[in-house]
Amino acid sequence: MANTITYETLFEKDLQERLARPQNWREVCKVTMTNTRVINSQSISTAGDWAAVGTLTRGTAFDPTDVAEVADTLTISTGRHVTTYFDFGDLAQSPWTNEREIFSRAGERLGEFIETNVLAQHASWRNIGLVGGVWTDNNSTAGAASAANIDDLARLIRRVIREQNGASLMAKNGAFATVAPATFEFVEAFAQANGFGSADDALKDGLAPQVKYLGLTWYVSNDNASDHAMAGIRKVQRLGILQGTFGRMHKFPGIAGTSGGIQSGIAFHSRVDIGHLTPTDHANLVLDVNDTNS
């Protein structure tokens, strides 16, 4: 015997919450919002890394040190968009597809693009590699961060910054690392195994991303380039964003159809235009950690 049953269907009033990818670019980059295409920033260049100290003999002439200004250029020219089209009938009949939801998700996607694009600039940064199980400055050998070496990595990042004369800037802005979840797990394990009150807290609650530990602020990202993680001093890497397009939402009703007519619907459009710069004088203060966990 088999009955035929019609079951009640329940529809939730809201779309399922989107699983957003972490975004850290606002925290680690110096962000400039402008409608200017090209941004020039100057640095001073001399053979003596500023004005060289010379010998002075009383009553004897001396020569000054020549100083030259060097321009670093950031060009805002990389554009991306998120554009979706909906039929007017579908918009009227779907309680889930509304402008707030559409533009909110478009904004998240564009922010995720910026995150990925920032982390893709690793070729401009100073390398840290893993050689024979030891984190090594100015080396591009890839290796995996682990429970045995995560504290060594944190100490090396801070040491390299000091050796590159970035101690005062580190004290002002702070040092950071943007790592994969697998690497952050080892930071969490280290915190749970060391200390007293802090270890108890870490055992009870774990560590939340953007936590300061081992002298660094640790960020988590799922968008690091393969085998690369970003570290160094916060607000050194430059990011330019075109102010006139960022966060703007546009609606285009009745867009052209494939047959030459128009479609009975509306397109929702948002875009972002960006550019990057690793400043010449501070290039050694942004680090490419060659971590295979990424």
Feature locations, PLM:
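Short helix/loop capping segments that flank catalytic or ligand/cofactor-binding pockets
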Residues: 49-53, 94, 186-189, 277
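Alpha-helical scaffold segments that mediate packing/assembly in large oligomeric complexes
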Residues: 88-163, 286-294
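Long, hydrophobic/aromatic-enriched structural stretches that serve as scaffold segments
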Residues: 58-104
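Long, acidic, intrinsically disordered low-complexity segments
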Residues: 29-63
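Intrinsically disordered or highly flexible coil/loop and linker segments, enriched in small
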Residues: 25, 48-53, 115-119
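Extended, solvent-exposed, turn-rich assembly/linker loops in the middle of proteins
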Residues: 128-205
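Sequence/fold signature of self-assembling virion shell proteins
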Residues: 3-9, 13-22, 26, 35-38, ...
